[in-house]
């Protein structure tokens, strides 16, 4: 499992004093209010202030003191140590842990690997790349087991639930 988890991506500058606008990669933006530090390119940085906007977060990060400096951080990921992450409820997983999981069906047939997790609102969808690309709804009727330790996700056979 990865030691660091991405919680946001710097998408723009905000103002002229080095604040950055962050697109959250977490399902609860309020978590940013509790963050004391983040890692950017492996370097620890203190969070000096946090403002929540409807779809983004504005952060003042230690060492970024001008709009020019903030511009250098566009498209950079903000990461936290796994040990500082929220504890997930049973049956919930970090996207970082699902990516590259091997997907097999209940008959043992290899489908591919999870390459992305798409948020749809009602349920997540796993993008699985193998011989072809398969979109797998992340619902209990289809996904029967997730074993993060062994990086394996088991689903019902495609012919049972997939429309041609």
Curated annotation (Swiss-Prot):
Coiled coil: none annotated. Residues 90-161 form the PRC barrel domain. The keyword Phosphoprotein does not apply. SUPFAM superfamilies: PRC-barrel domain, Translation proteins. It is found in: Cytoplasm. Pfam families: PRC_RimM, RimM. The PRC barrel domain binds ribosomal protein uS19. This is Ribosome maturation factor RimM. It comes from Clostridium botulinum (strain Hall / ATCC 3502 / NCTC 13319 / Type A).
């Amino acid at each position: 499992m990865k030691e660091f988890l991405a919680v946001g991506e710097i998408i723009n500058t905000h103002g002229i004093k080095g604040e950055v606008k962050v697109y959250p990669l977490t399902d609860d933006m309020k978590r940013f209010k509790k963050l004391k530090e983040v890692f950017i390119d492996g370097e620890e940085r203190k969070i000096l202030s946090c403002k929540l906007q409807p779809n983004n977060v504005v952060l003042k990060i230690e060492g970024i003191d001008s709009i020019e400096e903030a511009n250098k951080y566009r498209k950079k990921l903000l990461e936290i140590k796994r040990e500082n992450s929220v504890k997930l409820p049973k049956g919930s997983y970090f996207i970082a842990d699902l990516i590259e999981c091997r997907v097999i069906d209940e008959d043992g047939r290899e489908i591919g690997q999870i390459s992305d997790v798409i948020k749809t609102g009602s349920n997540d969808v796993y993008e699985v790349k193998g011989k072809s690309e398969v979109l797998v709804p992340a619902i209990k009727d289809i996904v029967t087991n997730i074993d993060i330790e062994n990086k394996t996700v088991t689903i019902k056979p495609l012919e049972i639930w997939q429309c041609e």
